[in-house]
């Protein structure tokens, strides 16, 4: 009887573990469906394909679904990426240069589109990953294989998004770590609008 009891206990524990991890995809779906607005600080580390070179940056990320977001990079230099639902603007303060593209062509099935409220199950294959670093992980892989990135793993601490772990089509590895996440924010009507500064070079594609 004891010999049978141990395998039964092991099977129960394994089943409980799988059930807990399976919640990561549901947590992602809940986050996309229920969290309409948010703001967080972020740090980003990009590693080159050979794994040698690393670039670090930091700033603030804001979003308001559907299809509005703002990445404001503060360090090591100022850069702004704004999606207003119609266009995506990139502004480089050092060069005083702004460029824009249509929202759909700029993002497609990308992590930014996913966070801004893209068609989750339509655009991505979802899978549960093993727990690591104290986070529950879900992986989103674009169904279209000719895009700019291969996959993104989203790490959740409870119901809060904590990490984006991105592998792009060029072999780069980017990790965005979020902190001080606040949700349910009432943004001003023009919070995700961008107007190029006077004198800036403007490139529209």
Walk through the language-model features, giving the residues of each.
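N-terminal leader/targeting segments and the immediate start of mature chains
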Residues: 18-54, 67, 196-205
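Gly/Pro-enriched, hydrophobic low-complexity segments
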Residues: 99, 119-125, 129-205
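Positively charged n-region of N-terminal signal peptides that target proteins for export
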Residues: 1-4
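An acidic-aromatic
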Residues: 60-109, 174-175
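Short, solvent-exposed helix-to-loop capping segments enriched in aromatics
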Residues: 32, 107-121
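Extracytoplasmic
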Residues: 35-37, 56-58, 64-66, 76, ...
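Bacterial N-terminal signal peptides
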Residues: 7-16
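A generic structural motif
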Residues: 43-49, 72-74, 91-93, 141-143, ...
């Amino acid at each position: 009887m004891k010999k049978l009891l141990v395998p039964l206990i092991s099977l129960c524990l394994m089943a409980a573990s799988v059930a807990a991890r399976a919640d990561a995809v549901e947590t992602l779906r809940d986050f996309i469906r229920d969290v309409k607005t948010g703001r967080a600080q972020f740090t980003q580390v990009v590693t080159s394909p050979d794994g040698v070179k690393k670039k670090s940056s930091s700033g603030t990320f804001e979003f308001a679904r559907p299809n509005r977001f703002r990445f404001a990079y503060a360090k090591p230099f100022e850069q702004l990426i704004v999606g207003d639902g119609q266009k995506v603007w990139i502004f480089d303060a050092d060069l005083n240069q702004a460029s824009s593209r249509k929202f759909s062509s700029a993002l497609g099935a990308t992590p930014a589109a996913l966070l801004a409220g893209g068609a989750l199950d339509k655009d991505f294959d979802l899978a549960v990953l093993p727990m690591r670093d104290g986070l529950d992980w879900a992986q989103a892989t674009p169904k279209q294989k000719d895009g700019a990135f291969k996959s993104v793993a989203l790490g959740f601490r409870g119901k809060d998004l904590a990490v984006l772990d991105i592998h792009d089509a060029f072999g780069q590895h980017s990790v965005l770590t979020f902190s001080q996440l606040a949700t349910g924010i009432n943004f001003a009507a023009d919070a995700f609008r961008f107007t190029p500064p006077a004198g800036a070079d403007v490139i529209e594609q």
